[in-house]
Regions:
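Hydrolase active-site cap/lid region
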Residues: 124-175
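Short alpha-helix in the alpha/beta-hydrolase fold that links the catalytic acid
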Residues: 48, 185, 194, 208-217
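N-terminal cap/lid segment of alpha/beta-hydrolase-fold proteins
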Residues: 1-28
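Catalytic active-site module of serine/aspartate enzymes centered on a nucleophile-bearing elbow/loop
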Residues: 231-275
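Catalytic nucleophile-loop/oxyanion-hole region of alpha/beta-hydrolase
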Residues: 71-101
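Short beta-strand/loop motif that positions the catalytic acidic residue
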Residues: 191-193, 198-200, 204
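The serine-hydrolase catalytic nucleophile loop
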Residues: 40-52, 67, 210
């Protein structure tokens, strides 16, 4: 299958350059899934790349981008906030819509899951939403992960442990935590109209399972909760990664149904259009 990837960039509402990659199949489509990566990750995360391949094979374009201060996007990571990340997700939605995509799905992983959830609550035209181990209560997760002493150290030093497993500490303003407290996902879930999927492993070592269950209960739209036995936060085992990405892809395909296939070409805007 001939897949085209195009490096693109757009500006967030505060003027920062956001780096992204638009990938589309050879046939015309107005369907696209926007992929939001996790904390201290980037647009080329394993989940994003595997999921992009699965969706492209089924005729759905993908757009993956880097949040502020991560990957190739502008900004010092230490100044990232949930508020800014949501603005960037909404800007990404506007960006793909400007490229001619009309049926748009949104996928978010962990931190990106919270961001996608909040963005979906402000984008009623969204066709579907898929969340991989989302963190609707980020403050709770941070408090559990760092403990009282770690939270105090963060406030004093402006650094946190490297949650990706590195030996050092990462610069991050304490204002990130304070901003998180203003952006819990449960209330946002109540106004989302798009069909919503939640996938999490029952051995997630970071995000408490009760958050996904409470989030599921708060959703008023069509919804589905998948708890995968034995899977950790990163879906480290190949079989867990395969199952998780397949479930996400199937949800997108179900709620972004295919039009009659036709040969296509790539126009200057980046979307696939009929020849």
């Amino acid at each position: 299958m001939a897949v085209v990837e195009q490096a693109l960039a757009f500006k967030d509402p505060e003027g920062h350059r956001v780096s992204g990659i638009l990938a589309f199949p050879p046939s015309h489509t107005d369907r696209v899934a926007i992929l939001c990566h996790g904390f201290l990750s980037n647009k080329n995360s394993t989940t994003n790349k595997v999921l992009s391949t699965l969706l492209l094979e089924r005729g759905i374009a993908t757009f993956r981008f880097d949040f502020f201060g991560q990957g190739e996007s502008e900004g010092p990571f230490e100044q990232i906030t949930v508020s800014l990340a949501v603005k960037e997700a909404l800007a990404a939605l506007n960006f793909v819509a400007s490229k001619g995509y009309r049926r748009i799905g949104l996928v978010g992983s962990s931190f990106g899951g919270l961001v996608a959830l909040l963005a979906a609550s402000e984008w009623p035209a969204l066709s579907c939403l898929a969340l991989k181990c989302p963190v609707p209560d980020f403050p709770e997760m941070l408090e559990l992960e760092f403990g009282q002493h770690g939270m105090a150290e963060w406030k004093t030093t402006g650094t946190i442990p490297d949650v990706t497993g590195g030996p050092g500490r990462v610069k991050l303003q304490y204002g990130f935590y304070e901003d998180c407290a203003r952006h819990l996902g449960y209330d946002a879930a109540k106004v989302i109209t798009a069909p919503t999927l939640i996938v999490q492993g029952d051995r997630d070592e970071y995000v408490p399972l009760h958050q996904s269950r409470r989030l599921y209960d708060a959703l008023q739209s069509e919804k589905r909760l998948e708890i995968l036995a034995g899977a950790d936060h990163r879906f480290s085992r190949p079989e867990d990664l395969r199952r998780m990405t397949t479930i996400l892809a199937d949800w997108m395909v179900q709620h972004l149904p295919a039009e009659r296939p036709e040969p296509g070409r790539v126009d200057d805007a980046g979307a696939s259009t009929p020849a």
